Amino acid sequence: MNKKIFWNWSNNENVLYIDGVIAEDSWFDDDVTPKLFASELKNKSGDITVWVNSPGGDCIAASRIYTMLLEHKGNVIIKIDGLAASAASVIAMAGTEVLMSPTSLMMIHNPLTVAIGDSKEMQKAMDMLKEVKESIINAYEIKTGLSREEISNLMDGETWFDKNKAIEMGFCDGTLTDRRKDEKVTNMVFSRRAVTNSLLTKINKEVKTHSMSEVEERLKKIKNKWEEK
C-alpha cells in the first residue's frame, strides 16, 4: 500500500502508531485493521516502538494484531500516551516492555456482543463470549502473572488503571519520562552552583572589607551591652 497509516520513520527508528478504533475492516482507511497493519509490518525487522491511543474495538482484530507483534523478530516497546482500553489493552500486552504516560489510562472489561434470535441463539452468544473472555485472559495472564480468577474479577468490574495502578498490577512496566527532565536538572544544578559561588564571593568581599580592629571593636560593643543588662 502507498499510504503508510501506521509507520513514521525518523532517526532510523521504527515507530508505529495505533491511533483510533480497532476494526476487522475499514471503509475509509481511518481504522486500525489487521490487514493494513500486516501490510506495513511484514517487511520490517528489528526493534520497534508502538504508540497506542485507542478506545478498543473488535476483539478478534485486536487478537490478530497482538499475535503479529508477539511474533515480531525484535523488541516491541509499547508506549501508551492516551488510552489503551478494551481490545487496545490486549494489543499492549504484546509488548516486550509497556510504558505509560503519567496521564494515560488503561481499561479492561468483559467482551461484548449483539445477538438476535431465540433462547438457543442467545445461549450460543453467551458461550461464545465466555470463550472470547478466556482467550483475552490468556494475554493478560502471560503479561501480569496474575491468576485467571483475579483477572476475571477485574474484567467483571470494568477496571480502569492509571499508570501507577497498572504498574502495581503488572499490566505496565514503567513510566514514560520527560526527555527534558535531565536537562532541567542539569540547568538547576549549574544555577545553584552559580548562586552559591556568587554568594561566597559576596561574603568574602564583605569579610575582607572589615579589619581585625573593626571586628574587635564590634565584639567589645556587644560585650558592653550584655554587661549593662
Where are the language model's segments positioned?
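N-terminal organellar transit peptides
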Residues: M1-K79, L83-A87, G95-K229
